[in-house]
Amino acid sequence: MDKTGVIYILTNPSFPEYVKIGYADDIDKRLLQLNRSECIPFAFRVYATYEVNSRLSDLKIHSIIDKLNPNLRSIENFNGKQRIREFYAMSPEDAYSILEAIAEIHGCADKLKRIAMDEAQKQAEETAQEIDDEHKERQSPFRFSMCNIQPGEEIEYCNNPEIKCTIVD
């Protein structure tokens, strides 16, 4: 039986390099299901929806993306089983453009909705970005310039001030 639902594009600041593309009869209930988990630091948010008249029509979108680039989908082997998920390594804008093209081909562009972020979502996005930036900074090799110590300046060993060196980076 056909029923109106939506193909959705979800984002999550916990993994900004991925989008989740799926189907839901009720997008609000789907968000509640996904965001109930304590396993992810930030909540999923709806980037866009595309109203459709048949369940599981998202599988057709998955098939198109997989045929164009099978490396975009999140697939892993875990405990001897292959886990194939609805996550794709693409920007939400790229995912949206795929749905937009399909909507235009079918003359249903009015059924495609891009959802604006509210203030709480913007704040969570900024927090996640700050955490990611901090993490990247901690992973990068140490440079004295990170401590505002410039080339040519001299530093000394704290346990023996007679041991000195000149900064060259």
Predicted regions and their residues:
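Short beta-strand-centered aromatic/proline hotspots
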Residues: 163-169
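Non-catalytic accessory segments flanking enzymatic or RNA/DNA-binding domains
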Residues: 1-149, 161
